[in-house]
UniProtKB/Swiss-Prot annotation:
Name of this protein: Carboxylic acid reductase
Reported function: Catalyzes the ATP- and NADPH-dependent reduction of carboxylic acids to the corresponding aldehydes. In vitro, also catalyzes the activation of medium/long-chain fatty acids as acyl-adenylates (acyl-AMP).
Protein species of origin: Mycobacterium tuberculosis (strain ATCC 25618 / H37Rv)
GO MF annotation list: ATP binding; long-chain fatty acid-CoA ligase activity; NADP binding; oxidoreductase activity, acting on the aldehyde or oxo group of donors, NAD or NADP as acceptor; phosphopantetheine binding
Keywords for this protein: ATP-binding, Fatty acid metabolism, Ligase, Lipid metabolism, NADP, Nucleotide-binding, Oxidoreductase, Phosphopantetheine, Phosphoprotein
Catalytic activity field: a carboxylate + ATP + NADPH + H(+) = an aldehyde + AMP + diphosphate + NADP(+); a medium-chain fatty acid + ATP + H(+) = a medium-chain fatty acyl-AMP + diphosphate; a long-chain fatty acid + ATP + H(+) = a long-chain fatty acyl-AMP + diphosphate; dodecanoate + ATP + H(+) = dodecanoyl-AMP + diphosphate
CC cofactor: pantetheine 4'-phosphate
Record-stated family: Belongs to the ATP-dependent AMP-binding enzyme family. Carboxylic acid reductase subfamily.
Gene transcribed to yield this protein: car
Cofactor binding comment, as recorded: Binds 1 phosphopantetheine covalently.
Binding site residues for NADP(+): T777, G778, F779, L780, R804, R814, D844, K845, P870, A871, A872, S910, Y946, K950
Domain remarks: The N-terminal domain likely catalyzes substrate activation by formation of an initial acyl-AMP intermediate, the central region contains the phosphopantetheine attachment site, and the C-terminal domain catalyzes the reduction by NADPH of the intermediate thioester formed from the attack of the phosphopantetheine thiol at the carbonyl carbon of acyl-AMP.
Single Gene Ontology BP annotation: biosynthetic process
Disulfide bond sites: none
InterPro entries: ACP-like_sf, AMP-binding_CS, AMP-dep_synth/lig_dom, ANL_N_sf, CAR, Far_NAD-bd, NAD(P)-bd_dom_sf, PKS_PP-bd
Length: 1168
């Protein structure tokens, strides 16, 4: 027995002697042996556990109390610093009562599928066990998946019932658009909580007459009054569970689990979990849609332990929950260990003072983490689901002291395969390595055989639900499962993970990179002769080995070459549209080329990857370690010394540390995006700057084209010395998960004197002669600029455009470039209209005083007659907290201008997406946004932050109208399409442009983009989009028609005209369209999608990055045909008709000319 094993044994003995809860949770060997006996059915197995441990605590979750706000009268939930538990007896009885209720009509019968959407909890576990009692098939849905990803699963499984947590009720209701079961059950529901009750009431109203909605409590109460339902008959081969997985690409596919496999979650002998024999007290944070979540939960219950659940699914309470639970088992994924590691460094950096003994402080902090955060009584630790770096493993084991960190390897399909690289016996029946010649891996390799690992296991899944074709692909002719992982066999039954067979590498943050394609991109650099991209799945970025060109060596010399090559790689990456995580963070310069002779090229001159990894792998891994150490040291130094250091140098160092550059490479005049930063790394920089300087720096400011690092430093200086501006934290609370319209009052944004004077200001000018326009470089904004220039020409007026830039001259140049798209008439028209009528100012609506000097701001306050505001930071990933500054506070800043000097009518461009959290029947054009959407969720769903930020702007405008009499017109736009007048003007990043390019570039389309009817025919459908010229004219015309009112328009195409995506393909194929396209239709949608994706991935880089590929998940299944508009447009259409807007004096239909224009414009821009 090793010293560590001896220490662990003594640790366990001490815990048995000193910790009553630990001792009371000791597993009963008789029960363990009984449930391991053959012939025991799954429901009987669970009954043995529940009755055998009847009086023990089975499940625990945080205690709650209900708190009523004295101002609003609304009741909410507050977490208490303790857990409440239910016993095994109570859990079994509760599940039985629920099963009885679910047996009543509409009854759930054996074999029925039931989808469950929610995070793991006592209620979730109750439902899961009830379904087992009924013989139903549980289909856990991923709460992180978008509705578009859930619908195909619901459609495929056709559930009899959907159970959803209250937090996911909105998504569940949306999912029902594809398949509507008879019953929807809501769990984790508290009737006293206003938001819970209102959500259920809204769902019932929306689904009235089609779906029965019950809360779990109502069903259990109903079940108590009914005769108990007997446990359903079961069979080992009966389907019991579907776990949906899609890997890195492809449509979701459901891995089938028979009852015998589900039993393996409960049995010690199955190999799913480590059979320690110690008490199991666990904190459960993994979802039930992941096999890891089920392993931990049911492994705990079968061991007679207590399974506690984290209080919040976003893990924001993880450390608090850990400290309260004091688990005996730490079953974490690498990301959780990363969080513990970050907490350690943060605490060490916080306490470290000059002259302190760092090693002693680190030991002290580790001891405190071990006892106070992790609870101090763990006896087992496991990591799995993704690779973990050797450095992190070593650090974790130093933290855990006497406990070894077990690294598990397995899959949804095969179960657990390896522990610490060793084959799990008897769970693994057989395995083999097969050669992968295209990657250079062979069983004859020395010193160890290498190849793809194929396995047979006791827990092997039988296949994917209703997907025999995909099932066949993952098994070889001998019945071995293809793991897709390249392994080296380093000893008997011992393996080391090397790579993915498809050479697509998953980085630690979950992003995938295709190394061969990146090598092709970076090989285009004139300074690069050869390049080998190297990645490690435990790291967030790749590295490289670069062989410089002969010219680069002779011109720069080896000693000066690295920064020059680094800059060249960044330039190539920008040109190819690469993401920051695809760019090598650092590289080794190799002056000896890769050749056939030195074994670093294959016979067909491809990179010999195994040999390259063997030759350079150790050096590259050392480079990873050096970079991590350097970054950690630099960030620690910045947190300690940054507050007292000059801002600009500190900012440059912070940007360099986060992006993996050297401070010498980061110039003050560099833009963050030019250094390889994106919106997510900008978010990390914003958080770091807040830690260093104690000020909020919005992501919008960091990524603004007007903000180089020097400008960012100026922003920080101003924020430190000046008056703090409104922020998400000051308005809603830094950690808010819900925001309220009542938070957004004008007095929090605008000084009292301005507000007091506003109602008595001179009325708006009778004639508009001076217009202030934001967002003129945007797609809609440029057309608004042309429209207003044309109108100002008639009245000898002026258009003032506010453009983000460092100077007025640069702002003018940015706006000029917007119109220079290859159409000489457009350029000439713009210049003629602008002569004497156009003023361009460098400014930003998100900045104090719009980023203008005081004299200029006052001039605008005195002279502007109308404000037109289409400007916004449009980002569908960033949270509301980061979009608050540019989109909400920026609107307030413009309102301050609108309410100074004289009242200036305000035209605001919003988005139809604000309606996503509003019941459809309430989402009308004349409703007050504060009334129909008083509270908004903050979550990580698609575009949640952007929609909330535009909602906030609407709320502020309503406030300004009500309090100050400000005329406001809001235009909620949906898809805005290209015009037919000008050449080259496209909104390249939008989904529709990407679709048109992709159809033309691949030459294939599905038989229909929509679901077919019962006879397999195309259905009538409608696509909601309007040409940008019409939208601009409508905004400019209607925006000035209501001088004293607050008016909202839904700018949408409302027609049931049968003009949809299928008709667009017809038009492209028509000889009369002039598109020059020939697009082949493929009847089978799945076949089209597969060929389409393959073709897109094979496109040249520039085309591929402009293609539909990043948004292809929206097309995984045929769309449900919609005829007409998703929101009412009566007010908008009546106003358009009355004002006779557009050629038709009405909302236009989409035409073949618009679709053909996309193709001609894409050709002009060199994308086709």
């Amino acid at each position: 027995m090793s010293i560590n094993d001896q220490r662990l044994t003594r640790r366990v003995e001490d815990l048995y002697a000193s910790d009553a809860q630990f001792a009371a949770a000791s597993p009963n060997e008789a029960i363990t042996q009984a449930i391991d006996q053959p012939g025991v059915a799954l429901p009987q197995l669970i009954r043995m556990v529940m009755e055998g441990y009847a009086d023990r605590p089975a499940l625990g979750q945080r205690a709650l109390r209900f708190v009523t706000d004295p101002d609003s009268g609304r009741t909410m939930v507050e977490l208490l610093p303790r857990f409440e538990t239910i016993t095994y007896r109570e859990l079994w009885a509760r599940a039985g009562t629920l099963a009885t209720a679910l047996s009543a009509e509409p009854a759930i019968r054996p074999g029925d599928r039931v989808c469950v959407l929610g995070f793991n909890s006592v209620d979730y576990t109750t439902i899961d066990i009830a379904l087992i009692r009924l013989g139903a098939v549980s289909v856990p849905l991923q709460t992180s998946a978008p509705v578009t990803g859930l619908r195909p699963i619901v459609t495929e499984t056709e559930p009899t019932m959907i159970a959803t947590s209250i937090d996911n009720l909105g998504d569940a209701v949306e999912v029902l658009a594809g398949h509507a079961p008879a019953r929807l059950v809501v769990f984790d529901y508290h009737g006293k909580v206003d938001t819970h009750r209102e959500a259920v009431e809204a769902a019932r109203a929306r689904l009235a007459g089609s779906v029965t909605i019950d809360t779990l409590a109502e069903l259990i109460e109903r079940g108590r009054a009914l005769p108990a339902t007997p446990i359903a008959d079961s069979a080992d081969d009966a389907l019991a569970l579907l776990i949906y997985t899609s890997g890195s690409t492809g449509a979701p596919k459901g891995a089938m689990y028979r009852e015998s496999q589900v039993m393996s979650f409960w049995r010690k002998s199955s190999g799913w979990f480590e059979p320690s024999g110690y008490p199991s007290i666990t904190l459960n944070f993994m979802p039930m849609s992941h096999v890891g979540g089920r392993q931990v939960l049911y492994g705990t219950l079968s061991n007679g332990g207590t399974a506690y659940f984290v209080a919040k699914s976003d893990l924001s309470t993880l450390f608090e929950d850990l400290a309260l639970v004091r688990p005996t088992e730490l079953c974490f994924v690498p990301r959780i260990w990363d969080m513990v590691f970050a907490e350690f460094h943060s605490e060490v950096d916080r306490r470290l003072v000059d002259g302190a003994d760092r090693a002693a402080l680190e030991a002290q902090v580790k001891a405190e983490l071990r006892e106070n955060v992790l609870g101090g009584r763990f006896v087992m630790a496991l990591t799995g689901s993704a690779p973990i770096s050797a450095e992190m493993t070593a650090w974790v084991e130093s933290l855990l002291a006497d406990v070894h960190l077990v690294e598990g390897y397995g899959s949804t399909e095969a179960g657990m395969v390896l522990n610490d690289g060793m084959v799990r016996r008897p769970a693994v029946i057989d395995y083999k390595l097969v050669d992968v010649p295209e990657l250079g891996y062979f069983g004859t390799d020395q010193p160890y055989p290498r190849g793809e690992l194929l396995v047979k296991t006791q827990t092997m899944f039988p296949g994917y639900y209703q997907r025999p074709d995909v099932t066949a692909e993952v098994f070889d002719p001998d019945g071995f499962y293809r793991t897709g992982d390249i392994m080296a066999k380093v000893g008997p039954d011992q393996f080391v993970y090397l790579d993915r067979r498809n050479n697509v590498l998953k980085l630690s943050q979950g992003e995938f990179i295709a190394v061969s394609k990146l090598e092709a991109v970076f090989g285009d650099s004139p300074l690069v002769r050869q390049i080998f991209i190297y990645g490690n799945s435990a790291r967030a970025y790749p590295l490289a080995v670069v062989v410089p060109s002969g010219d680069a060596l002779s011109r720069h010399g080896i000693e000066n070459l690295k920064p020059v090559i680094s800059e060249s790689l960044q330039e190539v990456a920008r040109a190819a549209g690469l993401q920051s995580y695809e760019i090598p963070r650092d590289f080794i310069i190799e002056t000896t080329p890769f050749t056939l002779e030195n074994g670093l090229l294959t016979g067909i001159r491809k990179l010999a990857r195994p040999q390259l990894k063997k030759f350079y792998g150790e050096r590259l891994e050392r480079l990873y370690t050096e970079l991590a150490d350097s970054q950690s040291n630099e960030l620690r130094e910045l947190r300690q010394s940054g507050p007292d250091a000059p801002v600009l140098p500190t900012l440059c160092r912070a940007a360099a540390a986060l992006l993996g550059s050297t401070a010498a490479d980061v110039r003050p005049d560099a833009h963050f995006a030019d250094l390889g930063g994106d919106s997510l790394s900008a978010l990390s920089l914003a958080n770091l700057l807040h830690e260093i300087f104690g000020v909020d720096v919005p992501v919008g400011v960091i990524v603004s084209p007007a903000s180089d690092l020097r400008a960012l430093a100026d922003h920080i200086e101003a924020a430190r010395t000046g008056v703090r501006r409104p922020s998400f934290a000051s308005i809603h609370g830094r950690s808010a998960t819900e925001v309220h319209a009542s938070d957004l009052t004008l007095d929090k944004f605008i000084d009292a004197a301005t507000l007091a004077a506003a109602p008595n200001l001179p009325a708006p000018s009778a004639q508009v002669r001076t217009v202030l326009l934001t967002g003129a470089t945007g797609f809609l904004g440029r057309y608004l600029a042309l429209e207003w220039l044309d109108r100002m020409d008639l009245v000898n007026g002026k258009l003032i455009c506010l453009v983000r830039a460092r100077s007025d001259e640069e702002a003018q140049a940015r706006l000029d470039a917007t119109f220079d798209s290859g159409d000489p008439y457009l350029v000439r028209h713009y210049r003629e209209l602008g002569a004497g009528r156009l003023e361009v100012l460098a400014g930003d609506k998100g900045e104090a005083d719009l980023g203008l000097d005081r004299v200029t701001w006052q001039r605008l306050a005195d002279t502007v007659d109308l404000i037109v505001d289409p400007a916004a930071l449009v980002n569908h990933v960033l949270p509301y907290s980061q979009l608050f500054g540019p989109n909400a506070a920026g609107t307030a800043e413009l309102l301050r201008l609108a309410l100074t000097g004289k009242r200036k009518p305000y035209i605001y461009t919003s988005t139809i997406a604000v309606g996503e959290q509003i019941p459809p029947e309430a989402f009308t054009e004349d409703a007050d946004i504060r009334a129909i959407s008083p509270t908004r969720r903050i979550d990580d769903s698609y575009a949640n932050g952007y929609a909330n930020s535009k909602w906030a702007g609407e709320v502020l405008l309503r406030e300004a109208h009500e309090q100050c009499g400000l005329p406001v017109t809001v235009f909620r736009c949906d898809m805005i399409l290209a015009d037919t007048s000008y050449t080259g003007q496209l909104n390249l990043p939008d989904m529709f442009t990407r679709l048109m390019l992709s159809l033309a570039a691949t030459g294939i389309a599905p038989g229909s983009f929509y679901e077919l009817d019962a006879h397999g025919n195309r259905q009538r459908a409608h696509y909601d989009g309007l040409p940008v010229e019409f939208v601009a004219e409508a905004i400019c015309t209607l925006g000035t028609h209501s001088p004293d009112r607050f008016v909202t328009y839904h700018v949408m195409n409302p027609y049931d005209d049968g003009i949809g995506l299928d008709e667009f393909v017809d038009w492209l194929n028509s000889p009369t369209s002039g598109s020059g396209c020939t697009i082949q239709r493929i009847a089978d949608y799945g076949e089209w999608l597969q060929r389409f994706e393959t073709s897109l991935r094979a496109l040249p880089d520039r085309q591929r990055h402009a293609s539909l590929l990043p948004l292809l998940h929206n097309y995984r299944e045929p769309a449900k045909p919609i005829c007409g508009s998703i929101a009412p447009t009566d007010q908008f259409r009546a106003a358009v008709q009355e004002a006779k807007i557009g050629p038709d004096k009405d909302i236009p239909h989409l035409t073949a000319a618009i679709i053909a224009k996309y193709i001609s414009n894409l050709r002009l821009l060199g994308l086709l």
